[in-house]
Amino acid sequence: MVRSTAGILVTALSNHEQVVLSHTDFHAPFAVQLQGHPLAAWVLRKLGWQLSFEGLPARQGVLIMYPHTSNWDFVVLLFMKWATGIQASFWAKDSLFNIPLLGRWLRYLGGVPVRRTTSQGMVGDAVALFEQAKQDDRYFWVALAPEGTRKKIPGWRSGFYRTTCGAQVPLGLVKLDYRLKTIRITDFIRLSGDEAADFERLSDVYHGVSGKNPQNASPICLLGADVPRAETVK
């Protein structure tokens, strides 16, 4: 196990966060320790951000980042990625990878081509990638914003949920709080497949977390009944 020497700042948790952490499914010390970049950690500190990260609980998993309310989120999270050493892939429409230069650039950044003709196809492709990574005992994490947009919508898109359930991997909850200027990657849970119970847990963990534009934060619930559910994943 290689421990990080990036100088990640682990701050004291509030009383509410201590209660929430007591209900998570994975606890430090985590199995996967990463090597971050000290310069990126220094930049975050100089910008006033406090970062808490103690590793990942498994070699495969899904990270969701909430709330996504501003284009600035990308900049902050990019420095977070460099500071922690987290290498995470992201989903992109498969046709984009057929464009010569763009496709190569997307793969360099960690893009994974998925079919978006149906949500079942996208989730099925993602689950298959996780299954292959498990067979190969290969590191593979996917990161995404569950809303899929920085604008307020009635709920979260179901792709992350059905992928995590279908692949049976840990779900990491990244809390991006502009009010406190904190980034916490300390909560990892197992989804049960019971949407009501799982989203109640998600609401508890993200309670009080404020985005850059709080009015744009989408409620923590799945979008309407027209969105395919977790049990459609085979």
Identify the role of each PLM range.
Residues 208-234:
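Charged phosphate-binding loop/patch that engages nucleotide di/tri-phosphates or the phosphate backbone
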Residues 9-13, 34, 46, 56, ...:
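Extended interaction regions within the primary functional domain
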Residues 7-49:
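Extreme N-terminal tail/first-helix region
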Residues 15, 71, 98, 213-216:
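Detector for Asparagine
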Residues 26-29, 45, 49-208, 221-226:
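Soluble catalytic domains of membrane acyltransferases
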